[in-house]
UniProtKB/Swiss-Prot annotation:
It comes from Schizosaccharomyces pombe (strain 972 / ATCC 24843). This is Tyrosine--tRNA ligase, mitochondrial. A motif ('HIGH' region) lies at residues 38-47. Gene3D superfamilies: HUPs (3.40.50.620), RNA-binding S4 domain (3.10.290.10), Tyrosyl-Transfer RNA Synthetase (1.10.240.10). Homodimer. L-tyrosine binds at residues 33, 77, 184, 188, 191, 210.
Length: 445
């Protein structure tokens, strides 16, 4: 079986292909690339869907490139947006680019290790040197405007630019479309052309909302190199149960950077996902063998309440993105916060506690101190009435809101509801606070 055929079979079986431009097993794919604009300091879960085909090509021995669009980010990609992006300061864009570069570097090594754990059917064992991370500023910084227009402009038709979905949608919207946004597709097309000429890249991957930008690139390469065989592959978009795209623009991003979304929160995101989304993601976002995926889903169907699919999905994504140690920590934290049996301080355990088997408070603090939901109560606020304390700790937006939730019985400390808005948090204590569906660890030690 050819490398390309093996790779395409994986992508098709995992529902990772939304559309392609005549990409067949008989095609000659040399190198593959995926772009990422540094509009935030981290990639997010939505980016994983487009990243996974690149991973499969990498694991099948193809040279792959991730292109950080630090130059094109100055214009703003209009795809999938109803309004223009806000202009980003150069220092922020540079910091984001550095952060994503380091994240991709860590991901490439973590993914290779994870694939080996999954007994991935490598067509050819890849080398880390086959995954290159580049920035498109490296080829734009010395490119003059007239040179760009004279080399690209003659090969592009304005009618085609205006016909692309990302453009027509915005032209019909109240906010309209800026000239900078209109020309974004030209620069992404030039990225493809540059990579084709300098690195023999002839396949670009992206989300389905990138189809217009990607095919602008294949069109440009074919016009400037009539004998070129270049291809495009897009993936489905990951959407919420309401059909909303999961991305930072929608305000619901789950970040891949553990400093922004800790491993416990990433784990819990998938544990709490709707069944249909979890089953899709199990195929798309893990490297488990295809036969095992079917077995897991069949087992899940016998008793969906056990969330077997969700547990495999959460464990595999955290293992792949954050590593083994992070997964172990997330699983311990999950048992302490969501186990079957009540334990001291509002925590839980997998089995009834016996003797001194439950962790000490310093041990629990060490487990949770880096989590976003961990709150320290220092001497300056420890005597505040409970409703004010919850506002100070940013658990509620106002003291009035906190009081309303306390009086309604929606707030519990330990395993007991707190019904007094003037309650004082005890000194030298560490408790689990549950505020509606949210969980926090409060520490006054």
């Amino acid at each position: 079986m050819s490398r390309l055929l093996a790779c395409l079979k994986q992508l098709q079986a995992r529902s990772l292909i939304h559309n392609t431009t005549l990409l067949q097993p008989s095609c000659n794919v040399n190198s593959v690339y995926l772009g990422a604009d540094p509009t935030a300091a981290s990639l997010h879960v939505g980016n994983l869907v487009a990243l996974m085909p690149l991973v499969h090509f990498f694991l099948n021995g193809f040279p792959v490139f991730t292109v950080i669009g630090d130059a094109t980010a100055q214009l703003g990609d209009p795809s999938g947006r109803s309004t223009s992006r806000k202009q980003m300061a150069e220092t922020t864009r540079t910091a984001n680019s550095n952060s994503i570069h380091n994240q991709l570097k860590d991901l490439s090594s973590s993914i290779l290790s994870y694939a080996q754990d999954c007994n991935y059917p490598f067509s050819q064992m890849p080398s880390s040197s086959q995954w290159s991370i580049v920035r498109n500023s490296s080829w734009y910084e010395n490119l003059k405007l007239l040179k760009f227009l004279s080399s690209v402009g003659p090969h592009v038709r304005v009618s085609q630019m205006l016909a692309r979905d990302s453009v027509t949608t915005r032209l019909q919207s109240p906010s309209g479309l800026s000239f900078a946004e209109l020309t974004y597709q030209l620069l992404q097309a030039y990225d493809y052309s540059y990579l084709y000429e300098n690195h023999s890249v002839n396949l670009q991957i992206g989300g389905s909302d990138q189809w217009g930008n990607i095919t602008a690139g294949t069109d440009l390469v074919r016009r400037t190199h009539p004998n070129a065989n270049v291809y495009a592959l897009t993936t489905p978009l990951l959407t919420s149960s309401s059909g909303q795209k999961l991305g930072k623009s929608a305000g619901n991003a789950i970040w891949l950077d553990p400093k922004l979304t800790d491993s416990y929160s990433l784990y819990q995101y998938f544990i709490s996902a709707p069944d249909d989304l979890a089953c899709k993601c199990l195929d798309m976002l893990t490297l488990l063998p295809l036969e095992q995926l079917e077995q897991i889903k069949a087992e899940h169907e016998k008793d969906p309440s056990q969330r077997i699919v969700h547990k495999y999905l959460a464990s595999n994504v955290v293992r792949m993105v954050h590593g083994k140690k992070a997964l172990e920590l997330a699983q311990i934290q999950t048992k302490l916060l969501h186990g079957a049996h009540q334990a001291p301080f509002g925590f839980y355990s997998e089995a009834p506690q016996q003797g001194d088997s439950f962790p000490s408070l310093p041990e629990i603090r060490a487990l949770f101190k880096d989590c976003k939901f961990y709150r320290t109560i220092d001497s300056s606020i420890k005597d505040q009435p409970f409703s004010r304390l919850l506002r100070t700790l940013q658990i509620y937006t106002s003291r009035k809101e906190a009081t309303e939730h306390i009086l309604s019985g929606a707030v519990s400390l330990g395993h007991k509801p707190i019904l007094d808005s003037n309650y004082k948090f005890p000194d030298n204590s560490l408790f689990v606070l549950r505020a509606g569906k949210r969980t926090f660890v409060l520490d006054s030690l």
